[in-house]
Amino acid sequence: MVRLAAELLLLLGLLLLTLHITVLRGSGASDRQDAAAGNNNLNLESDSTSETSFPLSKEAPEEHQVVHQPFPRQRFPPETGHPSLQRDGPRSFLLDLPNFPDLSKADINGQNPNIQVTIEVVDGPDSEAEKDQHPENKPSWSLPAPDWRAWWQRSLSLARTNSGDQDDKYDSTSDDSNFLSVPRGWDRPAPGHRTFETKEQPEYDSTDGEGDWSLWSVCSVTCGNGNQKRTRSCGYACIATESRTCDRPNCPGIEDTFRTAATEVSLLAGSEEFNATKLFEVDMDSCERWMSCKSEFLKKYMHKVINDLPSCPCSYPTEVAYSTADIFDRIKRKDFRWKDASGPKEKLEIYKPTARYCIRSMLSLESTTLAAQHCCYGDNMQLITRGKGAGTPNLISTEFSAELHYKVDVLPWIICKGDWSRYNEARPPNNGQKCTESPSDEDYIKQFQEAREY
């Protein structure tokens, strides 16, 4: 088998030589100088058989790989009269094996001839001229090998020099960064390496997609009732927000405002002593007696409440769900601050049974009363304008005094035994923006009959 492979390899070499002869005949090279140049190339490649491209191995006689490599073009001065190259005619070529040093001792009839053949095709003058006409078709790499190695060494030395500072102030967008050089120890943290965590982009666990909560933000107000927020990452392009209330000392001026209002109340009531319970008649045993209270002060106070408070938005403002929000009132033509009033402390299921969300206006230094607007919304987030779920104005805001708010605004509802029809008659719900009536007439009549029967 080895002998057969060697014979086939020799036959292949002879076929390639024959092909070469045919090419030489087609090119019209008939002078002896070209033949002598070909002879020198053959001798040169025969002497360097250790660098041949067709080695024959005993271990893998049937595995051959053909590697296409560009052949260097070399020129040698012609030598005439070489005995190993003979010509019988103008276009004949004979290969005399005994005249080759490495092939003269080869035994073709032996079992394992050690033969290595290298063939180099040298382009003729015609083909060289043709290639020179299209130099732009081939990429030109003008950087020689020594210059490339020098540039690479300079890049590596620069990376090593800056590696100490690069750990602390590395910026991927820096112009001095070398994207080809890989710093040593890139797969493990270097000694003394410092890690900076930013609040703008908190890290999160890739397993559950949720990161750690950030610190609570500063309270939204410096006095009174406000809120705080904190966030965390919940995945790609997702940020979760959590909110909580924060109580601060009462804002300066509120006490003075209430003291002024108390003075006005005492003067309007014709008495120097101010008693809010007696004024609003919340200690009466009968709802009718509370409703029949028509003091001059109450009339003026209610008039101020109507003129001072904003109108209820027709739809629930979602921005107040986590924080206070400024909402423009197109009737008053200015902004009013609102906050959510849907928490458990409001007990909507008792006082506003059909309401899902409620909001309450906030006091400001421009307020002429201590009242707050109260608006409630259904499941469709539309304003409830009438019925047992409609919001009613609070004569005393919870911001000022939760206890006084309970006595003035909540206790009358309890005295009337939850009969919202009579309570809303004394404290009519607000619909200053002429929103669509809700609930419908049929539902409203049904609620009214149930309230009367109760």
Swiss-Prot record:
List where Polar residues composition bias occurs: 38-55
Sorted keywords for this record are: Disulfide bond, Secreted, Signal
Coiled coil feature spans: none
GO CC list:
extracellular region
Show the segment(s) annotated as Disordered: 29-93, 125-144, 161-209
Leader sequence segment: 1-29
Domain annotation TSP type-1: ranges: 208-252
GO BP annotation list? negative regulation of angiogenesis
Which Pfam families does the record associate with it? AMOP, TSP_1
AMOP domain sequence ranges: 279-442
Ranges of Basic and acidic residues composition bias in the record: 128-137
Indicate where this protein resides in the cell: Secreted
The record lists its disulfide bonds as: C219-C246, C223-C251, C234-C238
Protein role: Acts as an angiogenesis inhibitor.
Q: What is known of its domains?
A: The C-terminal AMOP domain plays an important role in the anti-angiogenic function of ISM1.
Assembly and interaction partners: Interacts with integrin ITGAV/ITGB5.
Q: Which family does it belong to?
A: Belongs to the isthmin family.
What name appears for this protein in its UniProt entry?
A: Isthmin-1
Q: Which organism is it from?
A: Mus musculus
Q: Which gene encodes it?
A: Ism1
